[in-house]
Amino acid sequence: MKSYQRWIWELPEWPSLVFDAHRIQPLLAAAKKSQGLILGKAEMIGLEGLQTHIRDSLTQEALTTSAIEGEKLDPESVRSSIARRLGLDTSGAPIREGQRNIEGLIDVLQDATLHTDAPLSLERLCNWHGALFPTGFSGMQRIDVGALRAVPMEIVSGAVGHHKVHYAAPSPEGLAVQVDAFLTWFNQTNPNTGSRPMEGLVRASLSHLWFETLHPFDDGNGRIGRAILQLALGQDMGQAGRIVTLSRQIESCKDQYYSELERAQRSKSMDVTAWVEWMLLQISQASEFASRTIDSAVQRIKFQAIMANVALSERQQKTMKKLLDAGPKGYIGGMTTRKHEQIAQTSTPTAARDLIQLEQLGLLKRQGEGRSTRYYPAIEGWAE
């Protein structure tokens, strides 16, 4: 009697994923158009002009790829750590206690987005895994770090005895062979250097599904799988790929992401067209967001040029830098007299006068009245 096939990897054709090239064409064309806009804008600004934007994008990627896993990181610590890696001014901002785990995650993201020419190897994957779990523990549980899992893996939800199995990964026996097949395919299909180059955005979609289906590590597969997404995107787009934050887009529709992933992994055939279509839509939306934030970066550059021609006190310069470093909508609650007082180490009356003057100079916009007064940079789209 033929055994019951539950997961896509149980099909005899696995891992030969296929898709309908004609059906995906409209979504692929839309994604490529959004991608082209980003490439054009990035070229206009130049790499130096993009540095701050790359910092903000990597910050978003780190925060959201962790949020998908239910882990909340401190935004200021993440931003400061990334700024240090990029050689940007951090004004001595420290990494706060309890946030040391962000360093490993940033190592992974930076390696994936910066070293796009390096082949993806088992050693590189294991190094990423080791960086994510430097203590050898995931929470209270000891795991095999920097090595493929040696135990069965299930994705479940619900209470013990009433749990639902969303997915069961391939057995650890033969897993090394399966991972090797994935890595060989990934490197051979590199759109620029591969012996069998493949359309970059479709390749990114397939690579994420394939890796998540293997689920080769005890923990951290989601974060590593999304790092592979960013690597594939960078190999397709070059440096501009560093500013498209797919984890932010996935986090915004997390439930649908897991639903689409589960549907693809339960497929009764190797046809994963629906998954590729869904991923192309997410890439389009992530690219459109990146395009808007590049526009914001251009506005910021122009704003800083205006600000450079205005005589500001050291106190005002400190506070304006704080606001600009936080990025669009990044300074939660806006600037208040009390916050400026603490930043500039000055008196309340002086702090109030400073902010009023910045508003009069056209550098800040005021929201609210009285105790509810908040100030934001006078850049379109920067206020909350």
Task: Please give the residue ranges for each predicted region.
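FIC/Doc superfamily catalytic core
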Residues: 1-384
